[in-house]
């Protein structure tokens, strides 16, 4: 079963309305589970959500994006702040926020010498140039284990 077929099935089962556009995977999504594009009506989904959190959570994210989709084409408020969106999301048991992905691993850990603020980074920081954002103290590199 393709992703578009799966979204069509969820749309009919949970909303009673057809999904008439395309759904696709987008590996570049990092912090969201999916995106709705009002311009052409297609949906993008993050495959890492399905891999790490399973089919139940992924189905809730599909419901979330379908709330945007159906409300937009009905001419109702489809944004997160709109009451119609919040009510429909609650009716279909969709997720309000996407769960954090565990695949994001920090490679470097820096600690401020003065205030103890910790900074996890994927890329190294030039310690001669950068300082603590909270107290402007000197940063030191700790071994990540």
Curated annotation (Swiss-Prot):
The active site is at 65. One of its GO terms (cellular component) is cytoplasm. Its cofactor is Zn(2+). Keywords: Cytoplasm, Metal-binding, Zinc. It comes from Streptococcus equi subsp. zooepidemicus (strain H70). Its main location: cytoplasm. It is found in: Cytoplasm. Residues 5-141 form the SprT-like domain. Belongs to the SprT family. Binds 1 zinc ion. One of its GO terms (molecular function) is zinc ion binding. Signal peptide: none annotated. GO terms for biological process: response to stress. This is Protein SprT-like. Zn(2+) binds at residues 64, 68.
